[in-house]
């Protein structure tokens, strides 16, 4: 169930679903697994807000365990494509593909709530049963290219070397807000709503 909020206007009352009301304040919620439908919704909202006013920041609240690499990279590419700065605010967690998205916010405008967590790791992949060896080799090569692409983005976003990111992402690597700040994925830990 999606909550509804009611606003008083000069013409009376107007009701909105909560996400439409937040969008009016340039807030986008990126929550749950990253998949194509969710990514398309986030991308549409980014494009809409940028077309509406590209001089005002967009606030992207992130709480995701990660998910589809292609869907996540579509979000990241759109964040970089639009003119408006995208502030990212991690609440709960940004894991896996979520770290790539959250760390791709505008430099100086990447935030995290005090009890949120970050997690980086190498991308996962697999082949279904009955897969031919040649197809397995192609899938393995693609997975290595994908890992390199993601680690390059994470290195650029954090200021760490590719070698360090590669080593740190070898297994699930959970980070507290303070550790995430020290690593360079965020710019500030927020204790209260001080966004402007």
From Swiss-Prot:
CDD domains: S14_ClpP_2. Its EC number is 3.4.21.92. The active site is at 96 (nucleophile), 121. GO terms for cellular component: cytoplasm; endopeptidase Clp complex. It comes from the Bacteria. GO terms for biological process: protein quality control for misfolded or incompletely synthesized proteins. One of its GO terms (molecular function) is ATP-dependent peptidase activity. It is an enzyme of class 3 (hydrolase). It is found in: Cytoplasm. It holds the Pfam family CLP_protease. It catalyses: Hydrolysis of proteins to small peptides in the presence of ATP and magnesium. alpha-casein is the usual test substrate. In the absence of ATP, only oligopeptides shorter than five residues are hydrolyzed (such as succinyl-Leu-Tyr-|-NHMec, and Leu-Tyr-Leu-|-Tyr-Trp, in which cleavage of the -Tyr-|-Leu- and -Tyr-|-Trp bonds also occurs). Keywords: Cytoplasm, Hydrolase, Protease, Serine protease. Fourteen ClpP subunits assemble into 2 heptameric rings which stack back to back to give a disk-like structure with a central cavity, resembling the structure of eukaryotic proteasomes. Belongs to the peptidase S14 family. Cleaves peptides in various proteins in a process that requires ATP hydrolysis. Has a chymotrypsin-like activity. Plays a major role in the degradation of misfolded proteins. This is ATP-dependent Clp protease proteolytic subunit. The lineage of its organism: Bacteria, Bacillati, Bacillota, Bacilli, Lactobacillales. The gene is clpP.
């Amino acid at each position: 169930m999606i909550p509804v909020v009611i606003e008083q206007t000069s013409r009376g009352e107007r009701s909105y679903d909560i996400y439409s009301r937040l969008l009016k304040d340039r807030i986008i919620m990126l929550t749950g697994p990253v998949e194509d439908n969710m990514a398309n919704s986030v991308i549409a909202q980014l494009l809409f807000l940028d077309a509406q006013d590209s001089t005002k920041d967009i606030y992207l609240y992130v709480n995701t365990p990660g998910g589809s690499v292609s869907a996540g990279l579509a979000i990241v590419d759109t964040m970089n494509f639009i003119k408006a700065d995208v502030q990212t605010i991690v609440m709960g967690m940004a894991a896996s593909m979520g770290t790539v998205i959250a760390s791709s916010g505008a430099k100086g405008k990447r935030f995290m709530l005090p009890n949120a967590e970050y997690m980086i790791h190498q991308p996962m992949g697999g082949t279904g049963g009955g897969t031919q060896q040649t197809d397995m080799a192609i899938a393995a090569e693609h997975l290595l290219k994908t890992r390199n692409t993601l680690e390059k983005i994470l290195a650029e976003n954090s200021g760490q070397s590719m070698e360090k990111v590669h080593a740190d992402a070898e297994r699930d690597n959970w980070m507290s807000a303070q550790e995430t700040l020290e690593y360079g994925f965020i710019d500030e830990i927020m204790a209260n709503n001080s966004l402007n």
